[in-house]
Amino acid sequence: MNKALFLCLVVLCAAVVFAAEDLQKAKHAPFKRATACFCPGKADRGDLWILRGDCPDGYGYTTYCYKGPNICCYPH
């Protein structure tokens, strides 16, 4: 019984370590959770971020416009 319990504990610890490693990789993945949007006076497409007050850092956004409680961010 003790060996089986110890084996379960080892497997559980290994699962936690691998899950934490996957979360660290996912944090740095270049994945945007934005949809397409257009602002008045802009010809190209922007990224619509839902229920955000400002554009997120790290995507190179330079201009923006507000669409209700959402924000449309434009790179470069």
Swiss-Prot record:
SUPFAM superfamilies: Defensin-like. Weakly expressed in the ectodermal tissue from the distal and proximal tentacles, body wall, and oral disk. InterPro entries: BDS_K_chnl_tox (IPR012414), Myo_ane_neurotoxin_sf (IPR023355). Residues 20-31 form a propeptide. Keywords: Cleavage on pair of basic residues, Disulfide bond, Hypotensive agent, Ion channel impairing toxin, Nematocyst, Neurotoxin, Potassium channel impairing toxin, Secreted, Signal, Toxin, Voltage-gated potassium channel impairing toxin. GO terms for biological process: regulation of blood pressure. Disulfide bonds join C37-C72, C39-C65, C55-C73. Belongs to the sea anemone type 3 (BDS) potassium channel toxin family. This is Kappa-actitoxin-Avd4m. It comes from Anemonia viridis (Snakelocks anemone).
